[in-house]
């Protein structure tokens, strides 16, 4: 399967990257705090915690910060290492999930997808599922079938199999999530396996969005990469985003330390130098800060973004791009959990979960700043974003430092909100 980058490379689109609106200083945000943000990131590079990072902040319709620190790859005695650049490519892992969820919302608006439909309506391998009881070692029938809504909000009874146990062992034995398996192969492997809880009764971060990707492929009749290109990347001008990076652009790809600088644990990242068989809706994309900002402009604009050549772009002639209605974006970014229990510690205190994003339920309770209604998510490789509609603000931080992710998710919002 060809990379979504290939056609763009052939047509020389790599020479053009849409510009985000820029604001000359002084900005609506405090310049001293913005300078401090960059300095803090540089300090982390100097301390050997990060190879490098790219930060982007967009406030009140303008990009007020887009900066790079450090290097694209860890220092090497054998060769010169390129400096981190604003257009460096990063594996964004689970920051893929909101984009796939956006496409599901588009299909819902078109009447081609119902969130109340059982997953088995689209993927028959998920019919007749059973739930495993770790205490008794037995399985029981589901009390109700998992729905598309459950996939979007991670309440389908699926898992990521990071922990020990009978069901995680079954995932590993079936090679669930193998990069050598297609989305159809994933469904065949995962569908017959027992669930870890009854659908709709608990939030548990899982392979649910990967299964959603298979649903999208069934509805559209084409690969996930082709769907995302046609529906999202093309219209928004996200020319640097896809499931792999062509050879001519691999010099722009960021890499992590071989081992975590604090724990010594190995940190292998997915290989994105060739088109994967598995186009993972849950974690497979490569992107840049500018490209992901185009997606977040759409989200902050409640379904509408300036055209790739928009008011402050390259020629000022681009028409706005509308991919969703504003009510649908509001629905997507509302809390869909209520009082459901949450498994694990991935979802921070003070947050619920919408359809592909964590949603802040109160200004307090959490350990990081943010308004109620603010939504966010991160990627395993060391990437993070948040959108704050109340402040007309979004921010992106891209690194390739898996071991520092949780710390950065706490640090970065504090640095950004300090500039308001």
For the regions a language model picked out, list residue spans one by one.
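Short, surface-exposed beta-strand/loop micro-motifs that present aromatic residues
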Residues: 374, 381-390
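Intrinsically disordered, low-complexity terminal tails and inter-domain linkers enriched
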Residues: 5-11, 76-81, 304-319
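Short, surface-exposed loop or secondary-structure junction motifs
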Residues: 62, 121, 128-310, 315-369
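Generic C-terminus detector
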Residues: 401-420
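Short, well-ordered beta-strand elements
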Residues: 64-65, 385-386, 392-400
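Short, conserved catalytic-motif segment at the N-terminal edge
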Residues: 28-92, 112-114, 128-137
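Active-site SXXK
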Residues: 35-41, 61, 91-119, 209-217, ...
């Amino acid at each position: 399967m060809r990379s979504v980058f290939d056609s763009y490379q052939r047509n020389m689109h790599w020479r053009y990257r849409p510009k985000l609106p820029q604001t000359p200083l002084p900005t609506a945000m405090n310049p001293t705090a913005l300078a401090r943000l960059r300095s803090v990131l540089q300090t982390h590079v100097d301390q050997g915690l990060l190879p490098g990072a790219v930060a982007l902040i967009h406030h009140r319709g303008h990009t007020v910060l887009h900066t790079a620190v450090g290097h694209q790859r860890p220092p090497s005695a054998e060769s010169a290492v390129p400096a981190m650049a604003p257009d460096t490519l990063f594996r964004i892992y689970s920051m893929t999930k909101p984009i796939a969820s956006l496409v599901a919302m588009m299909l819902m608006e078109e009447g081609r997808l119902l969130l109340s439909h059982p997953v088995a309506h689209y993927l028959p391998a998920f019919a007749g599922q059973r739930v495993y009881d770790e205490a008794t070692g037995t399985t029981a029938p589901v009390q109700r079938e998992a729905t598309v809504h459950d996939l979007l909000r991670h309440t389908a009874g699926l898992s990521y199999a990071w922990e020990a146990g009978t069901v995680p062992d079954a995932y590993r034995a079936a090679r669930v999530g193998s990069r050598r398996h297609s989305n159809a192969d994933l469904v065949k492997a995962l569908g017959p396996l027992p669930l870890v809880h009854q659908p709709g009764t608990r939030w548990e971060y899982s392979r649910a969005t990967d299964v959603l990707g298979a649903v999208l492929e069934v509805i559209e009749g084409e690969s996930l990469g082709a769907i995302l290109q046609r529906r999202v990347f093309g219209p928004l001008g996200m020319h640097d985003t896809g499931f792999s990076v062509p050879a001519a652009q691999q010099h722009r790809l960021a890499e992590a330390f071989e081992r975590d600088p604090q724990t010594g644990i190995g940190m292998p990242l997915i290989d994105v130098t060739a088109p994967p068989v598995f186009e993972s809706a849950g974690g497979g994309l490569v992107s840049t800060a500018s490209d992901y900002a185009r997606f977040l402009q759409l989200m902050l604009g409640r379904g509408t973004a300036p055209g790739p050549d928009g008011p402050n772009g390259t020629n000022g002639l681009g028409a706005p791009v509308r991919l969703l209605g504003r009510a649908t974006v509001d629905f997507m970014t509302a809390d869909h959990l209520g009082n459901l229990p949450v498994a694990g510690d991935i979802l921070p205190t003070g947050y619920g979960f919408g359809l592909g994003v964590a949603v802040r339920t109160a200004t307090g309770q959490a350990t990081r700043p943010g308004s109620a209604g603010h939504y966010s998510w991160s990627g395993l490789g060391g990437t993070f974003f948040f959108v704050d509609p109340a402040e007309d603000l979004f921010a992106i931080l891209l690194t390739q430092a898996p071991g520092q992710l949780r710390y950065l998710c706490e640090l970065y919002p504090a640095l950004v909100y300090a500039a308001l």
